[in-house]
């Protein structure tokens, strides 16, 4: 079995492709089950699997079964999402072994994010791991890998300043609006969505002077809670057309699988604004729409409407590109931390080479102990239960003490890349089948 990763991100695939391969929360159970189980009697692709799907990446982490190839994973993606492989295969990257660990640790640390050092990715990595754990697709290898990657993310944020003042996608979206429109005071701002992205956007909008904020979400309770925290107006989702009609800025970040705003919605909103101005010959009103969702919330052809400016997460590069330069001084330290965590994982992986021999050694020792204990007890008569327990405890203690040193030595040798050599020697010395 081998550690394997297939994925695409904001550096290899535009949002038009990322949204086609994104996995929703409702998709994950089915996808993970398909990857790790088989109804045909043939081995599944993965013995273990985790899917990380965010607005900027879709990545499949797995421990492959013998015979699994990259093409098998491509075929799975094509079949699951009902997309021709030719439409996305050129955007995929594939890693194996050590490179998988390095990629995940760097990802959890925010070093592969569109916004360098952003903190949200660590929670997204944790959520992906926990979702797979609930499904039962996480085994010992991915458990260890994701725990070490999360430590890498935590260490980078605590031991470097790379995350100090780091923008989030939400903050970048607000900054884009500020750059395009200037002062946000008096602007009608519509937030669509009730999750973390919307909450961060609300925080940053208020910090940048926005004072006329409306929140719309399918779940009214979440929208109401956000509105109360940030002094915003809350509207039911059914009032979205009316909210659009008065909005100057729209920031949308729902988890909807298809767009929730189409061209006719925005065209009607612009027409309403035009009528309200009572100026038929004036330039069309402007509306700034920032779509932070993947899959996208706003249909692409909305951008064709005069006066409408539509931006997606891919357009945020112009806002955040400077963060790489600003944080390059601490980037090297962060990469060193990532490498330390990678080496810790690799050391643990090497110790796994020793487990089969150690298991056989322990089993052989138990066989001998049980045989000799039974022989001794047959020769001793009239022992009380307490006396028998003492003798049995003595036999266990002797075995444990005798095995402690070779066990420790083999584990240490394995951690330093000598596991196979020492395991072979131990197997020969104790006549173990290896």
Curated annotation (Swiss-Prot):
Protein name per Swiss-Prot or TrEMBL: Glutamyl-tRNA reductase
Binding residues for substrate: 54-57, 113, 118-120, 124
Source species: Chloroflexus aurantiacus (strain ATCC 29366 / DSM 635 / J-10-fl)
Domain remarks: Possesses an unusual extended V-shaped dimeric structure with each monomer consisting of three distinct domains arranged along a curved 'spinal' alpha-helix. The N-terminal catalytic domain specifically recognizes the glutamate moiety of the substrate. The second domain is the NADPH-binding domain, and the third C-terminal domain is responsible for dimerization.
Family assignment from sequence similarity: Belongs to the glutamyl-tRNA reductase family.
Other remarks on this protein: During catalysis, the active site Cys acts as a nucleophile attacking the alpha-carbonyl group of tRNA-bound glutamate with the formation of a thioester intermediate between enzyme and glutamate, and the concomitant release of tRNA(Glu). The thioester intermediate is finally reduced by direct hydride transfer from NADPH, to form the product GSA.
Keywords: Chlorophyll biosynthesis, NADP, Oxidoreductase, Porphyrin biosynthesis
Protein residues bound to NADP(+): 193-198
């Amino acid at each position: 079995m081998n550690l394997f990763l297939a994925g695409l991100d904001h550096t290899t695939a535009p949002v038009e492709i990322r949204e086609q391969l994104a996995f929703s929360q409702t998709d994950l159970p089915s996808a993970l089950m398909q990857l790790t189980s088989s109804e045909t009697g043939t081995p599944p692709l993965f013995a273990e699997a985790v899917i990380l799907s965010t607005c900027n990446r879709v990545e499949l982490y797995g421990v492959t079964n013998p015979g699994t190839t990259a093409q098998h994973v491509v075929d799975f993606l094509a079949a699951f999402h009902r997309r021709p492989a030719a439409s996305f295969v050129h955007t995929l990257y594939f890693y194996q072994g050590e490179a998988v660990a390095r990629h995940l640790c760097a990802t959890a640390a925010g070093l592969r994010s569109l916004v360098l050092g952003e903190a949200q990715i660590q929670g997204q990595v944790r959520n992906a791991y926990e979702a797979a754990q609930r499904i039962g697709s996480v085994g010992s290898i991915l458990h260890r890998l994701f725990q070490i990657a999360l430590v890498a993310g935590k260490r980078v944020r605590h031991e470097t300043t790379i995350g100090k003042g780091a923008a989030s996608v939400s903050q970048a979206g607000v900054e884009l609006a500020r750059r395009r429109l200037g002062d946000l005071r008096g602007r009608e701002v519509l937030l669509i969505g009730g999750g973390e992205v919307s909450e961060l956007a609300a925080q940053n909008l208020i910090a940048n002077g926005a004072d006329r904020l409306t929140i719309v979400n399918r779940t009214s309770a979440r929208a109401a809670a956000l509105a109360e925290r940030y002094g915003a107006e809350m509207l039911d989702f059914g009032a979205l057309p009316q909210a659009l009609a008065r909005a100057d800025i729209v920031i949308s970040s729902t988890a909807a699988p298809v767009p929730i705003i189409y061209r006719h919605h925005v065209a009607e909103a612009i027409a309403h604004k035009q009528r309200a101005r009572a100026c038929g010959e004036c330039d069309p009103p402007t509306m700034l729409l920032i779509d932070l969702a993947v899959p996208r919330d706003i249909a692409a052809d909305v951008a064709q409407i005069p006066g409408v400016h539509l931006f997606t997460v891919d357009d945020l590069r112009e806002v955040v590109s400077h963060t790489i330069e600003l944080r390059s001084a601490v980037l090297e330290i962060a990469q060193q931390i990532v490498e330390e965590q990678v080496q810790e994982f690799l050391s643990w992986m090497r110790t796994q080479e020793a487990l089969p021999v150690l298991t056989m050694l322990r089993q052989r020792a138990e066989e001998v102990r049980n045989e000799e204990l039974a022989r001794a007890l047959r020769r001793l008569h009239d022992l009380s239960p307490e006396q028998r327990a003492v003798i049995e405890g003595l036999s266990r203690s002797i075995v444990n003490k005798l095995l402690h040193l070779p066990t420790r030595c083999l584990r240490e040798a394995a951690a330093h890349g000598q596991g196979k050599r020492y395991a072979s020697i131990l197997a020969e010395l104790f006549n173990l089948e290896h």
